[in-house]
Amino acid sequence: MTHVINLDGEHLTLEDVIAVARHGATCEIDQEAKKAVEASRKIVDDIVREKRVVYGVTTGFGSLCNVSISPEDTTQLQENLIRTHASGFGDPLPEDAVRAIMLIRINSLVKGYSGIRLSTVEKLLELLNKGVVPFIPEKGSLGASGDLAPLAHMVLPMLGLGHAYYQGQLLSGQEALDKAGIEKIALAAKEGLALINGTTVLTGIGALATYDAIQLLKLSDVAGALSMEVHNGITSPFEEDLHTIRPQSGQLATARNIRNLLEGSGNTTVATQQRVQDPYTLRCIPQIHGASKDSIAYVKTKVEIEINSVTDNPIITKEGHVISGGNFHGEPMAQPFDFLGIAISEIGNVSERRVERLVNSQLSKLPSFLVKHPGLNSGFMITQYACASLASENKVLAHPASVDSIPSCENQEDFVSMGTTAARKAAEILKNSRRIVATEIMAACQALDLKPENHELGKGTKPAYDLFRQHVRFIEFDKDIEIYEELNKASELIESDEFLAAVENAVDLSIQF
């Protein structure tokens, strides 16, 4: 990707984060932002020269804030900070999450409130642009005082320490720098703190989950519409007149999406044609999907505020004042990311119930478990079990992390957000729910092929079905088949941009009215 994103600390969007994290877009620092960074750094240099007492510059950290540090030890203080705070556990964060984290940290620093040298910010940018991805363990952050442990792991390779990925290989930090042609740096006063004190990790993980959730909301409407085709669903519950008298934005958008997807369908019905009403999982798609749309739209606004915010401490104002506060605290994002997890979980829950309706012969009027010879073959029986397992796991994961707190740092940091846990849970719920929705689409396409009378599909459901069938075949269970391979193909297809693009080329889909 040749697109270069200008970083000024003010205008970064969620789409920019995706472009950098997943599609290799490069970045540059805005010229005015460079001036702001340099002005802020001059104030820190003055503080050190004048031997003023400022937290994290000439003092220790956390409950050690009353320990004074001499000017000659300020550099060692910062390196010690990184070495001791790099205390994470677990598997590495995905590379796209780490790239998002690096980008968001740079964008925060270039606002010019952190007192970091421009050359240090440019070094982190060089790692990002040249594809050096620090090894960051996924666990170990309380979400206040920021994401200290994981961000310390981000900084290690800048010093020639730790580990990093480069061109798909996990290398020592120094080896990764050497292969990328990057020189290591030594940190100056306040720089270690400026690099690791903030909500960047939870925001990076949560930003990717938020973007993916928006795509999943559209996919869930496609899945619901395909289920409507199978069940000869009644279309009156999606009429605009019904929803304008309860003008919830997500509800209105969902009803419109379903109308667009089903336009021209020969399978849908009107009330009393086959039955008076449909079950809630079909009839209430606008209300259920719409509620999640509204929740996720709210989270997106919070994300776009946070990725353009300063979450450092202390901060240095444009007038030269040093303010020690709490912008590092993750609570403003912990609660939204818990909300995000709940909203995504509901999408998985309702999709799993529609999978059950598709495979249940009493409800679908099709062969049991969508197989031509039920009994000899079990068809989609255990596929529904697997979806139920994921949905139930989501219900456990949806328990809010932000309602918990464990005091730390000798009770100096006595109330923490657990926001990084909230973001990681939301990302896991997203993966589970996306699998369920992919299975609903697969089961609906199988069911459509089994229907004795199958009429023309709708304007949006037809391209969805056609593309799906190009990648995932109708399953003849009498022949040699391992169903998990087809399930994986289905998941890979809907995770790609190709599937949703094919539908959106035919009809407009949105998450807000």
From Swiss-Prot:
Enzymatic reactions: L-histidine = trans-urocanate + NH4(+)
Enzyme Commission number(s) of this protein: 4.3.1.3
Pathway: Amino-acid degradation; L-histidine degradation into L-glutamate; N-formimidoyl-L-glutamate from L-histidine: step 1/3
One Gene Ontology term of the molecular function aspect: histidine ammonia-lyase activity
Changes after translation: Contains an active site 4-methylidene-imidazol-5-one (MIO), which is formed autocatalytically by cyclization and dehydration of residues Ala-Ser-Gly.
PROSITE patterns the UniProt entry points to: PAL_HISTIDASE (PS00488)
Subcellular location: Cytoplasm
Residues with PTM 2,3-didehydroalanine (Ser): 145
Superkingdom of origin organism: Bacteria
GO cellular component annotations of the record: cytoplasm
SUPFAM superfamilies, per database record: L-aspartase-like
InterPro entries: Aromatic_Lyase, Fumarase/histidase_N, HutH, L-Aspartase-like, Phe/His_NH3-lyase_AS
GO biological process entries: L-histidine catabolic process to glutamate and formamide; L-histidine catabolic process to glutamate and formate
Entry's family note: Belongs to the PAL/histidase family.
HAMAP family (alphabetical): His_ammonia_lyase
Protein name from the UniProt record: Histidine ammonia-lyase
Gene label: hutH
